[in-house]
């Protein structure tokens, strides 16, 4: 079968680092090509070379059989290549229709925008994705998941021959993911080619026909998905076997450290639970169940309307994140790029940002040598892959950014560490490293709350699990009681709470 798109022998270097070396990718009509590899393997760089954001140093690009060079995203888009970015590329103050057709508005014979046609066409695209809202709604009023669906609708509007999807389901619910898969199958039937970049093995084996593996900027293999198992694919990605994906540390927790009684706040209703020293408490539930809201109320990022929180036997009131930090509660956000990191600042500045009081003299000046030593220690401990601590954090891979975000929390010497989706957008190798770090924190007596949408992660890492449903606690289970079926039943509100001390 002749490929719609072919990249061969692609090289791309930046000062001090070779990002791609002999990389290759084929996209076939009517087939979905998965592109996989650890963070930093070169997937994003390859997409930027393909769409003309970066100029390749060597190699050829064949588009519809002809050697081509795209001068930028506009030229690749006009040629028929659409891309759905992992980072949202929308303007919150504009409506959905205005975002979808920005720069391509429908105009009438008088040269004025034909709003009626524009909204009607946008509504058709939303209906294709099974979305329940109209296109006259402001994008800023939508959830992150709904905004991602608008991003997908925008790319569909170009009727591209090849569509690149970069982690398209990261912020989607199961229902939204199924709607996306339905659209992908429809696009396949029309002879379109899809590049599907994802860390989610389940999705790759469900929706993809072929898979291309990158490792350290190099092309490793192209295979039919049906010829592989999850284990063999992971081994190709990381170059080694990953024994025991969720390395649970079997160590009995200590005394109660955190006690939450009848906590209420935005999206949180009458929630009570405890957390012990050296314990990992998993928090499960569907999107919109109130898990993140509960953590933000606890930390002080959302207002508490009633209820009590005691830490080491003393009542604490957190009216702001500063109160949370001052009391030893650290929250690592699920959206590290929006809430967790300052992308234009360096690794060092990001890591020490909330712990500057430990490096300050009486007059307010910084003890730079102490700061650098602490950052250097954490970079080594966390195995952060960066050319130097002065590197802008926005240039690091997702897994390394997440390690810096966690390190920053630990620099404040917390008693309770809240990790909200700590491995979202992180490759399998970096996930394993993060799990090992979590176990290390547990061994040191830190109390950890692990919020995750990945049930195997919650089941594999937690000592005890609580489940949220519509702002309430719908279940509490020991490690032995918990199964995927039990957690899902509690997540949809079909199971009465089980509480075993």
UniProtKB/Swiss-Prot annotation:
Q: Which reaction does it catalyse?
A: D-ribose(out) + ATP + H2O = D-ribose(in) + ADP + phosphate + H(+)
For this UniProt record, give its keywords in alphabetical order, as a comma-separated list: ATP-binding, Cell inner membrane, Cell membrane, Membrane, Nucleotide-binding, Repeat, Sugar transport, Translocase, Transport
Keyword NAD present in the record's keywords: the answer is no
Give the highest taxon in the source lineage. Bacteria
Q: Which PROSITE patterns does the UniProt record give? A: ABC_TRANSPORTER_1, ABC_TRANSPORTER_2, RBSA
User: Which SUPFAM superfamilies did the record assign?
Assistant: P-loop containing nucleoside triphosphate hydrolases
Classify the protein's membrane topology as the record does.
Peripheral membrane protein
- Stretches assigned to the ABC transporter domain: 5-241, 252-495
EC number assigned by the record: 7.5.2.7
One GO term of the cellular component aspect?
ATP-binding cassette (ABC) transporter complex, substrate-binding subunit-containing
User: What is any one GO biological process for this UniProt entry?
Assistant: D-ribose transmembrane transport
Q: Name one GO molecular function term.
A: D-ribose transmembrane transporter activity
Annotated residues for binding of ATP: 37-44
Signal peptide (UniProt feature, chain positions): none
Predominantly, its location class is membrane
Q: What InterPro entries does its record include? A: AAA+_ATPase, ABC_carbohydrate_import_ATPase, ABC_transporter-like_ATP-bd, ABC_transporter-like_CS, P-loop_NTPase
The entry describes its oligomerization and partners as:
The complex is composed of an ATP-binding protein (RbsA), two transmembrane proteins (RbsC) and a solute-binding protein (RbsB).
What family classification does the UniProt entry report for this protein? Belongs to the ABC transporter superfamily. Ribose importer (TC 3.A.1.2.1) family.
This chain's function reads: Part of the ABC transporter complex RbsABC involved in ribose import. Responsible for energy coupling to the transport system.
Output this protein's name. Ribose import ATP-binding protein RbsA
Which source organism? Escherichia coli (strain K12)
Give the taxonomic lineage as stored in the record. Bacteria, Pseudomonadati, Pseudomonadota, Gammaproteobacteria, Enterobacterales
């Amino acid at each position: 079968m002749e490929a719609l798109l072919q990249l061969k022998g692609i090289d791309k270097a930046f000062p001090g680092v070779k990002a791609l070396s002999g990389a290759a990718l084929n996209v076939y009509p009517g087939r979905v090509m998965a592109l996989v590899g650890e963070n930093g393997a070169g997937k994003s760089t390859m997409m930027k070379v393909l769409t003309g954001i970066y100029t390749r140093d060597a190699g050829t690009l064949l588009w519809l059989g002809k050697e081509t060079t795209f001068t930028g995203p506009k030229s690749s888009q006009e040629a028929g290549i659409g891309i759905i970015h992992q980072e949202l590329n929308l303007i919150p103050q504009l409506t959905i229709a205005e975002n979808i057709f920005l720069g391509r508005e429908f105009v009438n014979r008088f040269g004025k925008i034909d709003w009626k046609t524009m909204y009607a066409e946008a509504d058709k695209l939303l209906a294709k994705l099974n979305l329940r809202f109209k296109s006259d709604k402001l994008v800023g009023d939508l959830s992150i998941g709904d905004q991602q669906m608008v991003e997908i609708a925008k790319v569909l509007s170009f009727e591209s021959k090849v569509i690149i999807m970069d982690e398209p389901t990261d912020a989607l619910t199961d229902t939204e993911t199924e709607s996306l898969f339905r659209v992908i199958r429809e696009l396949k039937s029309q002879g379109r080619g899809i590049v599907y970049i994802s860390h989610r093995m389940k999705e790759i084996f469900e929706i993809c026909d072929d898979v291309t593996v990158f490792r350290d900027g190099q092309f490793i293999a192209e295979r039919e998905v049906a010829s592989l198992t999850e284990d063999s694919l992971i081994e190709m990605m990381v170059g080694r076997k990953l024994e025991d994906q969720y390395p649970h540390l079997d160590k009995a927790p200590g005394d109660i450290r955190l006690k939450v009684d009848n906590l209420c706040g935005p999206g949180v209703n009458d929630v009570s639970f405890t957390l012990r020293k050296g314990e990992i408490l998993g928090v499960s539930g569907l999107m919109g169940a109130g898990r993140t809201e509960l953590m933000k109320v606890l930390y002080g990022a959302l207002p508490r309307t009633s209820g009590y929180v005691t830490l080491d036997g003393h009542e604490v009131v957190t009216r702001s994140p500063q109160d949370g930090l001052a009391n030893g509660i650290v929250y690592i956000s699920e959206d590290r790029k929006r809430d967790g990191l300052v992308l234009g600042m360096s690794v060092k500045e990001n890591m020490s940002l909330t712990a500057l009081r430990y490096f300050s003299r009486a007059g307010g000046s910084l003890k730079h040598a102490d700061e650098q030593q602490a950052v250097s220690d954490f970079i080594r401990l966390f195995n952060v892959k960066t050319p130097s601590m002065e590197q802008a954090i926005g240039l690091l891979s997702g897994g390394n950014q997440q390690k810096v975000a966690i390190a920053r929390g630990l620099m404040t010497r917390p008693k309770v560490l809240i990790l909200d989706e700590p491995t979202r957008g992180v490759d399998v190798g970096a996930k394993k490293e993060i799990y090992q770090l979590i176990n290390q924190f547990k061994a040191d007596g830190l109390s950890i709350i692990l919020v995750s949408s990945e049930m195997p992660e919650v089941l594999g890492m937690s000592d005890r699990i609580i489940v949220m449903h519509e702002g309430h606690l719908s279940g509490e289970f020991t490690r032995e009681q918990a199964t995927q079926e039990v957690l899902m039943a509690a997540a949809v509100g079909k199971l009465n709470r089980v509480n075993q001390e």
